[in-house]
């Protein structure tokens, strides 16, 4: 069983798509016990590979979702900033009219509230943008950690199997 496990671990370590078993093991594969050990390792290889791929795919989909949010926030920010420029321009014109008595003070106050609301919305969008960027960074880190954990686990198992194989020889 150790040779079959060693073949799986070597394939995992090298990132191969299938296991290349030791020639001695292939030669003895007519033996039902050895054949079963090889099949077990192939199944384990496929399961572990599929699980890793699934985890990384899930993380990538989350990253894409956050990137979509970033694009949406960018568009909303552009619209809000444009709106704020127009309101400020209108407010600037209105202030002169209010001073001269041609427009109501209430209209000026309403416009100032609109400026405050737009500024607040821009601040919220900027905060959301920062959170989405941070989330993308964390997700990328999680993907790297998942791959490193997998490699570390394979290397640890490789070292154990190598010791056991040497002990048997």
Placement of each model-derived feature along the sequence:
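Hydrophobic or amphipathic alpha-helical targeting/insertion segments
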Residues: 1-14
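Amphipathic alpha-helical blocks and their helix-capping loop/short-beta junctions
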Residues: 13-39
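Long, charged amphipathic alpha-helices with heptad-repeat/coiled-coil character
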Residues: 31, 35-169
């Amino acid at each position: 069983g150790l040779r079959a496990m060693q073949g799986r671990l070597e394939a995992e370590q090298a990132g191969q798509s299938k296991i290349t078993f030791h020639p001695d093991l292939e030669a003895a594969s007519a033996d039902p016990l050895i054949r079963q050990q090889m099949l077990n390792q192939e199944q384990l290889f496929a399961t572990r590979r599929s699980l890793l791929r699934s985890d990384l795919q899930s993380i990538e989909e989350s990253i894409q979702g956050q990137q979509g949010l970033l694009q949406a926030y960018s568009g909303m920010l552009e619209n809000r900033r444009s709106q704020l420029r127009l309101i400020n321009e209108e407010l600037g014109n209105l202030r002169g009219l209010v001073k001269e008595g041609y427009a109501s003070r209430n209209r000026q106050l309403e416009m100032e509230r609109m400026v405050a609301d737009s500024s607040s919305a821009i601040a919220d969008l900027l905060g959301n943008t920062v959170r989405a960027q941070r989330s993308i960074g964390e997700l990328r880190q999680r993907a790297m950690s998942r791959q490193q954990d997998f490699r570390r686990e394979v290397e640890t198992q490789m070292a154990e199997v190598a010791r056991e194989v040497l002990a048997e020889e």
